[in-house]
């Protein structure tokens, strides 16, 4: 573990890693500070970076598996202790590192008896195993195990559907996110006129926290570059013939009437610090803002694929704690 004393720059804005450690092959931790910042800037940067870290960084995962002799997902294969479903769940957890673009094929060819681990996966040159000891299956008899794998580099969360089943292969719910969690905190100093941003990052080992921070920052910059190159003369001009003047009273009334709705629309769900699973399931269901969330009932949420009652309870707890809001059991 590497830990440094926190010193605050009083001149140039700069990032600094103040703590770094490797808890295991699949768990890296890093803590960073950014200073000095003007009051309010730390929260703006922290929220944007957390969203980019959790949602915008690409990762590599196994997304499809094909067995030579499996009748269905919940069947068993003679000579293998695990069921097909258990093998799929073990393959889902395999952490990969790559500079892959799109998809590629891999395979497992193993003769029992013995333990099949991630080390036994035959990979293309541009894909690596992060933890070669990850367990896949235990062959108890001298049988041949042949498995075809589809590997994909993507971002976010891939949820299998019935439409994904093809050619006797089995799709896997894939979590592409290399960043397992990210938190930020803000500390004031200098008569509370300046701020320090603390950012904590946990990764699965396919990227270091420093690499993840670099990629998230680069992705944010890429999003804003088009605005920097936008030429004023190319902007659409307002059509003065179709404008309607509003009195100050009318403007005030409309703003007051929609104030609450506007505030809910401007608060995105990534700012609520939901766990990655809840965040991605909500996003897949086209729930992006707090207003979108409040337009659903508890019954609506429980119908979301892969959602459990515990997930709904966690959402209700966060809404109650931070906003004194609740969701109805149903909208009828």
Curated annotation (Swiss-Prot):
Disulfide bonds: none
Matching SUPFAM superfamilies: C-terminal domain of RNA polymerase alpha subunit, Insert subdomain of RNA polymerase alpha subunit, RBP11-like subunits of RNA polymerase
GO MF entries: DNA binding; DNA-directed RNA polymerase activity; protein dimerization activity
Enzyme class: transferase
Chemical reaction(s) catalysed: RNA(n) + a ribonucleoside 5'-triphosphate = RNA(n+1) + diphosphate
InterPro entries named in the record: DNA-dir_RNA_pol_insert (IPR011262), DNA-dir_RNA_pol_RpoA/D/Rpb3 (IPR011263), DNA-dir_RpoA (IPR011773), RBP11-like (IPR036603), RNAP_asu_C (IPR011260), RNApol_insert_sf (IPR036643)
Pfam families: RNA_pol_A_bac (PF01000), RNA_pol_A_CTD (PF03118), RNA_pol_L (PF01193)
Region (Alpha C-terminal domain (alpha-CTD)): 262-332
GO cellular component, one term: plastid
Biological process, per Gene Ontology: DNA-templated transcription
Keyword field: DNA-directed RNA polymerase, Nucleotidyltransferase, Plastid, Transcription, Transferase
E.C. number(s) listed in UniProt: 2.7.7.6
Region (Alpha N-terminal domain (alpha-NTD)): 1-231
Nucleotidyltransferase as UniProt keyword: yes
Subcellular location: Plastid
Keyword Plastid carried by entry: yes
Purpose of the protein: DNA-dependent RNA polymerase catalyzes the transcription of DNA into RNA using the four ribonucleoside triphosphates as substrates.
Oligomer status and interactors: In plastids the minimal PEP RNA polymerase catalytic core is composed of four subunits: alpha, beta, beta', and beta''. When a (nuclear-encoded) sigma factor is associated with the core the holoenzyme is formed, which can initiate transcription.
Domain remarks in the Swiss-Prot or TrEMBL record: The N-terminal domain is essential for RNAP assembly and basal transcription, whereas the C-terminal domain is involved in interaction with transcriptional regulators and with upstream promoter elements.
Family note: Belongs to the RNA polymerase alpha chain family.
Stated name of the protein: DNA-directed RNA polymerase subunit alpha
Species of the source: Cuscuta japonica (Japanese dodder)
């Amino acid at each position: 573990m590497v830990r440094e004393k926190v010193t605050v720059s009083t001149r140039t804005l700069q990032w600094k890693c103040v703590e770094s450690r490797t808890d295991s092959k699949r768990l890296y931790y890093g803590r960073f500070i950014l200073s000095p910042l003007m009051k309010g800037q730390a929260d703006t940067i922290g929220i944007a970076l957390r969203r980019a870290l959790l949602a915008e960084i690409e990762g590599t995962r196994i997304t499809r598996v094909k067995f030579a002799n499996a009748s269905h997902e919940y069947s068993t294969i003679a000579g293998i202790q695990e069921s097909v479903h258990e093998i799929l769940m073990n393959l889902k957890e395999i952490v990969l590192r790559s500079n892959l673009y799109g998809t590629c094929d891999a395979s497992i060819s193993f003769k029992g008896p013995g333990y099949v681990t991630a080390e036994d996966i035959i990979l293309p040159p541009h894909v690596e195993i992060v933890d070669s000891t990850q367990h896949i299956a235990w062959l108890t008899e001298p049988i041949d195990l042949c498995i075809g794998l589809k590997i994909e580099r993507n971002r976010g969360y891939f949820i299998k559907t019935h439409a994904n089943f093809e050619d006797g292969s089995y799709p896997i719910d894939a979590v592409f996110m290399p960043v397992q969690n990210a938190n930020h905190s803000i500390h004031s100093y200098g008569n509370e006129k300046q701020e320090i941003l603390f950012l904590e990052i946990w990764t699965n080992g396919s990227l270091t926290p420093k690499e993840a921070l670099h990629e998230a920052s680069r992705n944010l910059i890429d999003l804003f570059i088009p605005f920097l190159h936008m030429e004023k003369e190319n902007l659409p001009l307002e059509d003065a013939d179709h404008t309607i003047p509003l009195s100050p009273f009318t403007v005030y009334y409309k703003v007051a009437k929609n104030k609450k709705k506007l505030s809910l629309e401007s608060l995105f769900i990534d700012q609520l610090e939901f766990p990655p699973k809840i965040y991605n399931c909500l996003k897949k269901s086209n729930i992006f803002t707090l207003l979108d969330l409040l337009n659903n009932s508890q019954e609506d949420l429980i119908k979301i694929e892969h959602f459990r009652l515990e997930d709904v309870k966690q959402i209700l707890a966060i809404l109650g704690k931070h906003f004194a809001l609740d969701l109805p059991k149903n909208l009828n």
